[in-house]
Structures are given as C-alpha cells and as structure tokens.
C-alpha cells in the first residue's frame, strides 16, 4: 500500500458526501494514514466550513458529485468564487459514474482531479498526496 511521507502531521482532508456510509469509509482510510478528517454532508455545509476559521486546516477537499440540492459541480463553482484559501484548495471529485464523467466539465468548474467509487485506497492516497503537495 502507498504510505505518505514522514511529514504527515497536521494533514487535513474535507469529505463532502451526503452518504454516511461513503463518508465513514473514506474517513477510515484517511485516518489510517494519520490524516485529520472534516466532514460535510452537503454543499452548503462544505461552503460554510470553508468560510470558517477551520478552512486554514484543510489541504484537500473530496467532493461527491451527486448530492441532493447543490451537486459537486455547483458547490465547487461557488467555492471558487470565495476569497482566501477556498479559491486555491484542491478539490477532487468522487463519483460512481467514473467512465461517464466529463473531465473537461470538472476542470471548468474548478476541480483538480477525479476518483471513482468504490474508492481504491492506493489511488485515493496517491491523488491526495499529489494535490496536497505532501
């Protein structure tokens, strides 16, 4: 399995997913890698968190594409219009329809990567490590 470098303290990922099971699954993977995890169950909660003081802690956002209300694309577009760290934080789309997803549309919205569900541990850790610059 892929292991993060020695300098992995204070690493933090925000998981945005309306499905409790999916959030817990990814959270367990990341916590096994000594990564702090923040959770949001919808787009508005994610935006609220990214506008709070806790935003400074967040290195990467894992964004579910299909959520009730605001989907992942819409949420990302709003995040990218905000000031401060929100504009820069890497956002990785998570989707069960990996092969049908338009990568160009994700990039245009401001997303930095795509991970298919079910989540592969090594792929997840590699993507996060690369985008966070750890």
Predicted regions and their residues:
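C-terminal compact regulatory domains
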Residues: 1-134
């Amino acid at each position: 399995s892929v292991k993060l470098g020695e300098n992995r303290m204070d690493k933090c990922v925000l998981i945005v997913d309306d499905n409790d099971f999916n959030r817990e699954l990814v959270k367990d993977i990341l916590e096994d890698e000594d990564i702090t995890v923040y959770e949001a169950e919808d787009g508005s909660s994610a935006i609220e968190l990214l506008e709070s003081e806790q935003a400074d802690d967040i290195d990467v956002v894992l964004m579910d594409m299909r959520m009730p209300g605001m989907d992942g694309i819409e949420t990302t577009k709003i995040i990218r219009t905000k000031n401060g760290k929100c504009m820069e934080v890497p956002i990785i789309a998570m989707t069960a329809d990996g092969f049908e997803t338009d990568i160009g549309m994700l990039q245009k919205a401001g997303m930095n990567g795509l991970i298919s569900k079910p989540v592969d541990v090594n792929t997840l850790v590699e993507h996060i490590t690369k985008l966070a610059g750890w």
